[in-house]
Amino acid sequence: MSLLPYTSELGVSKAKHLLRRSCFHYNKTLLYQISSLNVDQALDLLFSDNTISYAQPYDPLPTESPHGYWLESTEYPPDMPNQGRKRGLLSQWWFYNMVNRNNIKDKLLFFLHTTFTISSGDIGASHYFYDHLRLLQYFSSGNLKELAKKITLDNAMLNYLDNTQNNANNPNENYAREFLELFTITKGEQIGEGDYSTYTEHDVIMAAKVFSGFKTKLDRSIIDPDTGIPIGRISVNQHDQSTKTFSHAFDNYQLSGGTDENTIMSELHEFVDMIFDKQATARAYVSKLYRFFVKSEWTADDEANIINPLAQQLIDNNYEIVPIVRTLLSSQHFFDFGDDDPNDEIVGSIIKSPLQLAASMIRTFEFIIPEPSEDLGNYYRFSMYFLRNNYFPMSGMELFAPETVAGHPAIYQSPDFDRHWFSSSTILARYRLTESLITGRNK
């Protein structure tokens, strides 16, 4: 088993496997189209569908009403009611667009959500969530290192992990800790008190100093020049301007503190570059990609022949995500080609998440979600009342709203991983989904 490419025509069986892993859904037309292609041609096709059914979510209330005052406004009125409902509209807007196209970038966007996790109910105003989704969409075929820089000034993230409260004289380490432990290099084997081999508690303290003074911008009037998306602000007088010295895990690297907005941004970029220069960071991302697209566990041989070479490729490509995903999804290993071990199956080894189950069932039954512009009432009844308020909570996967910053247990928690999707409390939602799509009764 290796990263050598699978070069034959896919055929129906391997086309199904590729589509199940790379997309949230497919139909018979796409399946038979893909089955006659080789994997490179198939991936070209699956990266090319950029259909956007609706550029913005529909809100039934007029924009001049406070209830509809939420997406493009640069003001922040003191009373913005129904923010939970508006965040629900946003998650269902993304779902509607995803179901109406076949694009690997939708799967990659959700991968980025599982990597740089927020919970939409804990980020403040709904338009912050809108900007956050657009940021993930922007980087769904982009650069992981650049996303790590940009997301630090994302208003939703600043609120979610309290970094907007992080000041030089009153440090808050929440974001710094999760940035190292979950978002980038991840925690390695503990080799001493406060020493996790990949970073130390001292590095968390230093990282919090780097992140100090980054604040939410309530009116969203600062626009990132690269993404065109609103970002937070830098409070120079609340930033720790001292020199930061990191531990042996980062070769005792010294980082000069910024003293104005430009040098503070340079300090942030240098800090992120320091982390991404480490092989452990590349291995962490590749391990997550492998678990997301291939299977939840792997052998020592997989580590040596798949994970480590892909990690080096990720570094060589300066953390561009698409080349790594293409290498993995086109490999003989991904298709279980030439593997005689019956206990090491890749095809059929991942239990569908409630999100993928819903999307795939909608396409399988050729269920047409009502169009918001033509049938707004039925669209809301299905998208909000059934999916958002009923199916997803009952299934154990509230969309873009995991219970903790670590994400859904099925994504990361050993030894069960994706088996977490099946429990006595969540299995009924799967049965009811099928029944509802067949009968048209939303339960």
Give the residues covered by each predicted segment.
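Activity-critical C-terminal alpha-helical subdomain
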Residues: 155-223
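N-terminal accessory alpha/beta regions
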Residues: 14, 26-139, 222, 228-229
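Short, conserved phosphate-binding/catalytic loop or strand-edge motifs used
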Residues: 125-134, 153-158, 173-182, 304-308
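Flexible, low-complexity segments enriched for small/polar residues
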Residues: 2-28, 278-317, 325-443
